[in-house]
Amino acid sequence: MKKPVVIALAVAALAAVLAGGTWWYQSRQDNGLTLYGNVDIRTVNMSFRVGGRLASLAVDEGDAITSGQVLGVLDKAPYENALMQAKAGVSVAQAQYDLMLAGYRDEEIAQAAAAVKQAQAAFDYAQNFYQRQQGLWKSRTISANDLENARSSRDQAQAQLKSAQDKLSQYRTGNRQQDIAQAKASLEQAQAQLAQSELDLQDTTLIAPSDGTLLTRAVEPGSMLNAGSTVLTLSLTRPVWVRAYVDERNLSQAQPGREILLYTDGRPDKPYHGKIGFVSPTAEFTPKTVETPDLRTDLVYRLRIVVTDADDALRQGMPVTLTFSDEARHE
C-alpha cells in the first residue's frame, strides 16, 4: 500500500511544480510589454554634384556596396580642360602680382629719365620759338596764324614734358598700393577658380557614402545628366534601426538605453537584441502601417531601436515583435 501512496504524492508534487511554473511564466509574460514595429527603410539617392555625360557605372542592382567604393564616372574631358585653363589663369595673375610688388627695373627708370631730358629740350625749343614769334608779331612781321601755331607747339611740348616727368616719378616711387591690392585680388580670384575646377573634376567620380545594397540603377552609360539628378539608390544596411510606437500608458517603460528582444517570423525562437536609441518628444497619431489594432486611433510616441547583433537576415521593412521583458532589461 505504501508504493501507490508514494506514487500519488510524487504525481501531486509534479503537478504543483508544473502549475507553479506555468503561473510564473504567464505572470512574467503578462508583466512584459510587447510592441510591433518594422525594420526602418533607409535609403540614399546618389547623384553627381556636376553635370555631364555618364561614362561608366561599376555596379548593378543588388550589389553589395562598401563605403568609399567607386560607383560611376562622368566624362572628365570638359573638366580637365577647365582645370588647365584655371591653372593658366593663376600663372598670369601671379606674374602680374609679382611685377607689381617688384616695381620698375633700373633700366626702365633710366629710360624714363632720358625721355624727360628729351621732352625738356623739345619744350625749351618750343618756348624760345614762341617768344621769338611774339616779337615778330608785335612788329607785324608774321601773321596771327603763325603766332597761334607757335603757341600750340609750345603747349604740346609742355604737356609731353609733364607726362614724361610723371612717368619718371611713378617709376622711382613704385606702384601704388591700390594697384598692388587690385593685382592681389585678381590672383586670389584666379586661385579660387582653380580650387573650384579641381573640386569639379573630383566630383566627376561618384563615391559610395557608406555600406549598403544597391536598390536601383536609374540611368545607363552615355546618358546626359544634370547636376543633382539621381543616378543610383543605396539601401543603408548598417546600423539596423527598428521603428515602433508606444502609447502614453507604457511610455515609462521605453526609456533610452533600455535593452529589448526582437523577434521575426523567420526566427521566432531566437531573438535579436537591441537598445532604445531615441524616443520622440512629441506624440503623433499612429501610422497606418502599425499592426496593433488597439493603437491605430491613439496618440503614440515613436521609438527607434538600434539592433546590436543584426545580420543579413534582418531586411528593411520586415515586421518585428519587440518584447520589453525583465530578461531583456537585465540581459
UniProtKB/Swiss-Prot annotation:
Locations listed in the record: Periplasm
Kindly indicate where the leader peptide sits in this chain. 1-15
HAMAP family referenced in this protein's UniProt entry, alphabetically:
UPF0194
Q: Which UniProt keywords apply?
A: Coiled coil, Periplasm, Signal
Instruction: Answer yes or no on keyword Signal.
Output: yes
- Could you say which protein family the record assigns here? Belongs to the UPF0194 family.
Q: What is this protein called in UniProt?
A: UPF0194 membrane protein CKO_02332
Its cellular-component GO annotations read: periplasmic space
Which InterPro entries does the entry mention? CusB_D23 (IPR032317), UPF0194_membrane_YbhG (IPR022936), UPF0194_transport (IPR050465)
Q: Does Signal show up as a keyword for this record?
A: yes
- Cross-referenced NCBIfam families: PRK03598.1
Write out the coiled-coil annotation as residue ranges: 142-207
Instruction: Give the source species.
Output: Citrobacter koseri (strain ATCC BAA-895 / CDC 4225-83 / SGSC4696)
| Pfam families given in the database record | HlyD_D23
Q: Which PANTHER family match?
A: EFFLUX SYSTEM COMPONENT YKNX-RELATED, UPF0194 MEMBRANE PROTEIN YBHG
